[in-house]
Structure formats: structure tokens, C-alpha cells
């Protein structure tokens, strides 16, 4: 059985604790070791009068049972005084239970200003004042638990309680924001809507029902939510009579009611009303960003369905010269250099793991077929988007805080080299006017020398900058494609880690939105979100694994549309449909069902067009002649070499960064053997080296040990055996 929940040493402030729910909370906390401040003004349920007896009786009751408590008789509007009592008596404040409340029930037309104001002063402003007084102390100690008290009247409304309902729902909004702001300091805030007998409810509920709704049936939930082991934050719970339920918002998919070249009308709203109110496929937004984040998806649907935005006023459109004049502008060229370390770091950042043996080729430079993940191509090009690059483009004047990464396209013309330096050239390909925003389309071309390696297209949506009279579509924009209307052919899932964004940002995307809780909070997120291009990398890796056996030479292109944010720790689920060489896919958060990447696809090179033994440039490898010669010369000295070497050497010869051929020199039995292909048994050491470097070793231009330490020669297995290369190649093979 799990250990009981204790509050030893925790200082708990309960407001309105002179009776009813507050009294039950105070007694329960004290019974489990808490040091309790029992606050009660001592008035009646209408907020009239004051006195000390209510709080004193509860304190006395706690002390009789061996607990520790002190009384406070101040109004919750004087929140500083309540918290000062806790600090002066016990030296800290750990838990605040905002429970104090009164009623002034009137039908709406009979509510006076005083009836309205006093309800808000006690419930909403009182909760604010007490919590604010405790907030900084909780931040300094990096710990706090806050409980807000709402009501079914606030959630659903109730006749005769307009003042009370408004205040109680306001408390929920206050809690939701405090949960976001307090998370980074281990301050959790939750809300309950209790059904219990009290001084307030005894006037509106039958006596037998009041008895059934005992405060003791609410207190256990309060204690759990306020315990240090409870990770719940920002929750809303109804509770009463021994029952507890959690509430959440739900939203219909809704309907787009704008038609091309027609004004948006109330008739269009009426005609779509059934769809607007249809909850059969509802979403459940949890953050303000999830609530507003679908705007990009809506705008793309507007385009694809032939619907256009319409101005809601007769104001003249903004000048077109600025945005239009930016089209065709070339940004300064730049170089992106990287080593195997950056390639591996990226692979880990998008979920590659040693737990999956097939991922080893992406995370271990000594792997025989070590490769860059194809989507590393976006890292090469992303400098064009960093460091305010767009801000230098003449005519582009907008608030960059309102810029969203809408879509991404990447095409590879050959596999990315495992390391190297690429020169990148970026140009503003087009700018589209979406009415409520503008889409900036930027093309980035990456070259190795004069050879084009990859091409990226970034589509950036800027909220609120549209309406300048520009064109809405462009043949230059790589089109997103809807997924087929049938069950997926394959589904893969990967759980992201809580450190996923922190790891991915090491690949060069330093946006504080993905690491800084304060910055994320200002942007409307409850915590830092995962990079969209990190989700992009996870998804592409799933497709490559499922339909190309992780063969990077088969990857041709990828197009995605970013729909919603992902939080580190959530599970990414990629749903895939195969149609010829195109793999359509969409990516969801498994826990919520939210689509986070939509209208996406990967184009693959046909498997029949892939050669595993010859380099892409064609032609014979020089090393093949050398291995043939070694085989011939060892015939006369093979037994002697076997005695000295006693090992099986497997060679992986690379060309253009990929394995072009495998050879085995078996010096473990008989007179030895040289043959093309992997070792028939197990190799003692595997050596990875390019065809060019192999020839330099053979001709004595490159020392094997120096090649190893410089990274030009890699070995796995018993790497000490690589020291015998000189003996094999020179002393015996006479090369």
C-alpha cells in the first residue's frame, strides 16, 4: 500500500476556514502535519458583520487534536496581512486555498451596484490579493500549491446568480494563467467547483441534500491537489458526495463561411449553422495557441476550396509596392559547414536512437554505412531564416513576432555528404496576399562547388500583414497534397523526451520559444514548444524507415504543412499512405489526436534504380584492383600471414559518402582468403575508408594511424588489429 499523504512542515493558508468547506480543509491539513493559518472574517454568508469566534473555534479544535494553527481575522481583500500572519508565525507559505466567499443572490434586474461589487471583491479580487501576496515567496522557494474555488454557477450559469457566476468564472481564468506562469517555478494552480453543504448553500438546497453533500467529501481532493507529489496543473474539477470529475473545453471543427468574390453574410452563417455546431468530430484545445494556431490551416483550406478573404470595411488596401518589390530579392550568400558531429547531433534531435539498430547508421560515425539524415538539408539552409535575415529585405516591414512557419519543402539531388561545406543562395521567390496575412515564399539552393546538392522552400505566414491587393496563388509555391481518404497503410509512433527541444536546438535553431518558459508564456504557450522542423524530422525518419529501409539514396523530396504545436514529452504518430513512389503522411500527437503536420508527402526514388555496389558516378573502384592483387600475392605467403594476423578484416569502401563496396580479408584459417562482400562469419575488425584514401594508404602517402586519428579511416570491433594493416599491405602483399 502506498504511503499516506503528509504535509509535515508545510504552511497552509485556508481562507474562509471558520466553517463549512474551509473548516474541513483546515482540519484535514492539520491532521496530516500541516501548519495551518485559519482565516475567517467572521461575518454571515452575505458578507455582513465580522468577528473572531469562527476562526478561533477551528484553531482550538486543531490544537486539541495535537495540531498547530493560528487564526487570522482579516478580509481577503487585505491579502498581504493574511500572508504576513503565515510568515511571522511559521516563516514561509507553501499552500494557499482560496475558499472565502459570500452570496448576494438577486435576479439580474434587481442586482445593485453594491451586490455586484462586493461579490467580485470577495471572490475574484480576494483570490487575486491573497495569491499575489504569496506568489513571490513561492517563486523564491521554487515551490507552491494554489487552489481556486469556482462553482457550477460559474461554469454553467444559474438563475439569480449573475454576479456570483461572473466572479466564479473569472477565478477560473485567473487560475489558468497562473498555472502557465507558475509552472517554471514549481507553482501549481488548480480550480475546483465543489458541491457541498455550507452557510451559503444551506439557503438554496434542501436540508437532506445539504447533509449528503458533506464538506468531508470535498476535502480529500483539495489535499491531493495541494500535495507536493501531485503534478496536476491548470485543471478544473467538479466534486461532491464522493464523486470527482475533470472538465475540459471542447470545440467543433466548425465551418468556413467565406465565398470567393462575395461578401461574408449572416445568411452564410445560418446555412452552415448545423456544421458549426456539430460536435461529432470535436477538438479539445488546451492552450491559447492551440485555439488560434489553426488559422494557417484554415487559410490553406480557403485557398484549396476556392474561397477568398473579403474585407470587412471599405478601407483602402495597403500600398502594394513594399511587399511586391521584395519579390526576386537575393539575400547575401552564405556557407554552411558541418562535421559528422553536427549530423549525429541532428539525428539524435529528431529521435534517432541506439535502441533501434537501424538508426545506428545515423548516430555512429564508425558505422559501415554512416549517413546524414536527408532532412538535415533544412539545417544547412536555415541560416537564411536566422539572425534577422528577412529583416534586411527591402520592402519587408512587419512584426516578426507574428511570423509562423507555415510550410516546408526539401528536395535532394544526391545524398548529403557525411561532412562538408555547402554554399547557400537564398531568394524571395514570391509573396502572397491571404487577406488576414501574407505568405513569404523563400527558395534556398545549396551547392557543393558548382554541384546543386539540395533545394529548400520556406513558406512563412505573417499574421495581420495581408490585404495589400497582391496575388493569392503562385506557381512557384510547392503544393501541399491532401492525404488519401482511407485508413493508413502504416503507422509509426515515437515518444519525444522532455529534453527534445533542448537537444534539437543544438542544431542551430536558437529561438527562445523552444527553451525559455517566460518567452513561451508571452507567446501564449503554457510551456516551451517543440520546433516544427523537429517534428518534420521525426516524420521523415518514420517514412524512410517504413518504406525505404533507411536507405538515404532513395529519398528525393518532402513537403509538409505545419498545423499545430507539439510539447516535448508528447508522442508523435506518423500515419502513412503509399501511392507509387509517393508516401503521403500526416503526423498527430498520439495523446490528443491533434494533427500537427498535414497535407504532407515524401517522394522516393524507385528501389530498382538504386545500386548498392557501384558509386553514383559510375566506373570501377580503384580499390577493387588492389584487393584482387592482395588475394593473388597472399597465395604464396598466406599461412605465414595467418599465423601473425589471426584475424578477419572486413572493409567498407565508400564513394561520395556512401558505401560502394565491401571486401573481406580472412587471415584466420588455412592460407587465408580474400573475397568481395561482407565476412562469411563475424569480422574481428571492420574498417571504413574512402576509395581515394585507401589508395593513399596503399601507396604510402597516408599513414593508417594518422588516418584513424584524423577521422579519414574508421574502425569498429578490435580496432587494435588495424595496426597490422602495414604488415598486410607492405610486408606481405608487397604493395
Curated annotation (Swiss-Prot):
PROSITE patterns from the UniProt entry: ADH_SHORT
Phosphothreonine: residues bearing it: 265
Ranges where the record places region (3R)-hydroxyacyl-CoA dehydrogenase: 1-305
Binding-site residues, substrate: 151, 705, 723
Residue ranges constituting the MaoC-like domain according to the UniProt record: 483-599
Subunit structure and binding partners: Homodimer.
One cellular component term from this protein's GO annotations in UniProt: peroxisome
Entry-linked InterPro entries: HotDog_dom_sf, MaoC-like_dom, MFE-2_N, NAD(P)-bd_dom_sf, Peroxisomal_Beta-Oxidation, Sc_DH/Rdtase_CS, SCP2_sterol-bd_dom, SCP2_sterol-bd_dom_sf
Name of the protein in its database record: Peroxisomal multifunctional enzyme type 2
Pathway membership: Lipid metabolism; fatty acid beta-oxidation
Motif (Microbody targeting signal): 733-735
Substrates-to-products reaction catalysed: a (3R)-3-hydroxyacyl-CoA + NAD(+) = a 3-oxoacyl-CoA + NADH + H(+); (24R,25R)-3alpha,7alpha,12alpha,24-tetrahydroxy-5beta-cholestan-26-oyl-CoA = (24E)-3alpha,7alpha,12alpha-trihydroxy-5beta-cholest-24-en-26-oyl-CoA + H2O; a (3R)-3-hydroxyacyl-CoA = a (2E)-enoyl-CoA + H2O; (2E)-octenoyl-CoA + H2O = (3R)-hydroxyoctanoyl-CoA
Primary gene name: Hsd17b4
Highest taxon of source: Eukaryota
Active site: 164
Gene Ontology molecular functions: (3R)-hydroxyacyl-CoA dehydrogenase (NAD+) activity; 3-hydroxyacyl-CoA dehydratase activity; 3-hydroxyacyl-CoA dehydrogenase activity; 3alpha,7alpha,12alpha-trihydroxy-5beta-cholest-24-enoyl-CoA hydratase activity; enoyl-CoA hydratase activity; estradiol 17-beta-dehydrogenase [NAD(P)+] activity; isomerase activity; protein homodimerization activity
Keywords: Acetylation, Fatty acid metabolism, Isomerase, Lipid metabolism, Lyase, NAD, Oxidoreductase, Peroxisome, Phosphoprotein
Sites where the protein binds NAD(+): 13-37, 40, 75-76, 99, 164-168, 196-199
Record-listed N6-acetyllysine modification sites: 46, 564, 668, 706
Chief place of localization: other
Taxonomic source organism: Mus musculus
Pfam family name, one: MaoC_dehydratas
Binding site for (3R)-3-hydroxydecanoyl-CoA: 405-406, 434, 509-514, 532, 562
Further comment found in the protein's record: The protein is found both as a full-length peptide and in a cleaved version.
Amino acid at each position: 500500500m502506498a504511503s499516506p499523504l503528509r504535509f509535515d512542515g508545510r504552511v497552509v493558508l485556508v481562507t474562509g476556514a471558520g466553517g463549512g468547506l474551509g473548516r474541513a480543509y483546515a482540519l484535514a491539513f492539520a491532521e496530516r502535519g500541516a501548519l495551518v493559518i485559519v482565516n475567517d472574517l467572521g461575518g454571515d454568508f452575505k458578507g455582513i458583520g465580522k468577528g473572531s469566534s469562527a476562526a478561533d473555534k477551528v484553531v482550538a479544535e486543531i490544537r486539541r487534536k495535537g495540531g498547530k494553527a493560528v487564526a487570522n481575522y482579516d478580509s481577503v481583500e487585505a491579502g498581504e496581512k493574511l500572508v504576513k500572519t503565515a510568515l511571522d508565525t511559521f516563516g514561509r507559505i507553501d499552500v494557499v486555498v482560496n475558499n472565502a466567499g459570500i452570496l448576494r443572490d438577486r435576479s439580474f434586474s434587481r442586482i445593485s451596484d453594491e451586490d455586484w461589487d462586493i461579490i467580485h471583491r470577495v471572490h475574484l479580487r480576494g483570490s487575486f490579493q491573497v495569491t499575489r501576496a504569496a506568489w513571490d515567496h513561492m517563486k523564491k522557494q521554487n515551490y507552491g500549491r494554489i487552489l481556486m474555488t469556482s462553482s457550477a454557477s460559474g461554469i454553467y450559469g444559474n438563475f439569480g446568480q449573475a454576479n456570483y457566476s461572473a466572479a466564479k468564472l473569472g477565478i477560473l481564468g485567473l487560475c489558468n494563467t497562473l498555472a502557465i506562469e507558475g509552472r517554471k517555478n514549481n507553482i501549481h494552480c488548480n480550480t475546483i467547483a465543489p458541491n457541498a453543504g455550507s452557510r451559503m448553500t444551506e439557503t438554496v438546497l434542501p436540508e437532506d441534500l445539504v447533509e449528503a453533500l458533506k464538506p468531508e467529501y470535498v476535502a480529500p481532493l483539495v489535499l491531493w491537489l495541494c500535495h507536493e507529489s501531485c503534478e496536476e496543473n491548470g485543471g478544473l474539477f467538479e466534486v461532491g458526495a464522493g464523486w470527482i470529475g475533470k472538465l475540459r473545453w471542447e470545440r467543433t471543427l466548425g465551418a468556413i463561411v467565406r465565398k470567393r468574390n462575395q461578401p461574408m453574410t449572416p445568411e452564410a452563417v445560418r446555412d452552415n449553422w448545423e456544421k458549426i455546431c456539430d460536435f461529432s468530430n470535436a477538438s479539445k484545445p488546451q492552450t491559447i495557441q492551440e485555439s488560434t494556431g489553426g488559422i494557417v490551416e484554415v487559410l490553406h483550406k480557403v485557398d484549396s476550396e476556392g474561397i477568398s478573404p473579403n474585407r470587412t470595411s471599405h478601407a483602402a488596401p495597403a500600398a502594394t509596392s513594399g511587399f511586391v518589390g521584395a519579390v526576386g530579392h537575393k539575400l547575401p550568400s552564405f556557407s554552411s559547414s558541418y562535421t559528422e558531429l553536427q549530423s549525429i547531433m541532428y539525428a539524435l534531435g529528431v529521435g534517432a536512437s541506439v535502441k533501434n539498430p537501424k538508426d545506428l547508421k545515423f548516430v555512429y560515425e564508425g558505422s559501415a554505412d554512416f549517413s546524414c539524415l536527408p532532412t538535415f538539408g533544412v539545417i544547412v539552409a536555415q541560416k537564411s531564416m536566422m539572425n534577422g535575415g528577412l529583416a534586411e529585405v527591402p520592402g519587408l516591414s512587419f512584426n516578426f513576432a507574428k511570423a509562423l512557419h507555415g510550410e516546408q519543402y526539401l528536395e535532394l539531388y544526391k545524398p548529403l555528404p557525411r561532412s562538408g561545406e555547402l554554399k547557400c543562395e537564398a531568394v524571395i521567390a514570391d509573396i502572397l496576399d491571404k487577406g488576414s496575412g501574407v505568405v513569404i515564399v523563400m527558395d534556398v539552393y545549396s551547392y557543393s562547388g558548382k554541384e546543386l546538392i539540395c533545394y529548400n522552400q520556406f513558406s512563412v505566414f505573417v499574421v495581420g500583414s495581408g490585404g495589400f491587393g497582391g496575388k493569392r496563388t503562385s506557381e512557384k509555391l510547392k503544393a501541399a497534397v491532401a492525404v488519401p481518404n482511407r485508413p493508413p497503410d502504416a503507422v509509426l509512433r515515437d515518444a519525444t523526451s522532455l529534453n527534445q527541444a533542448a537537444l534539437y536546438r543544438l542544431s542551430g535553431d536558437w529561438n527562445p520559444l523552444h527553451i525559455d518558459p517566460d518567452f513561451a508564456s508571452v507567446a501564449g504557450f503554457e510551456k516551451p514548444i517543440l520546433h516544427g522542423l523537429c517534428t518534420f524530422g521525426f516524420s521523415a525518419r518514420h517514412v524512410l524507415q517504413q518504406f525505404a529501409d533507411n536507405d538515404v539514396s532513395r529519398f528525393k523530396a518532402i513537403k509538409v504543412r505545419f498545423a499545430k504545436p507539439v510539447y516535448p514529452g508528447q508522442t508523435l504518430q506518423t500515419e502513412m499512405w503509399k501511392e507509387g513512389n509517393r508516401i503521403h503522411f500526416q503526423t498527430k500527437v498520439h495523446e490528443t489526436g491533434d494533427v500537427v503536420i498535414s497535407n504532407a508527402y515524401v517522394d522516393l526514388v524507385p528501389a530498382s534504380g538504386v545500386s548498392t555496389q557501384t558509386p553514383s558516378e559510375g566506373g570501377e573502384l580503384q580499390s577493387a584492383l588492389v584487393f584482387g592483387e592482395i588475394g593473388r600475392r597472399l597465395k604464396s605467403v598466406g599461412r605465414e600471414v595467418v599465423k601473425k594476423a589471426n584475424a578477419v578484416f572486413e572493409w567498407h569502401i565508400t564513394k561520395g559518402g556512401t558505401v560502394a563496396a565491401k571486401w573481406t580479408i580472412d587471415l584466420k584459417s588455412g592460407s587465408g582468403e580474400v573475397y568481395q562482400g561482407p565476412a562469411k562469419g563475424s569480422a574481428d575488425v571492420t574498417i571504413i575508408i574512402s576509395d581515394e584514401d585507401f589508395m593513399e594508404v596503399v601507396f604510402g602517402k597516408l599513414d593508417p594511424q594518422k588516418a584513424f586519428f584524423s577521422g579519414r579511416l574508421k574502425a569498429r570491433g578490435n580496432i587494435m588489429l588495424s595496426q597490422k594493416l602495414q604488415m598486410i599491405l607492405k610486408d606481405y602483399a608487397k604493395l
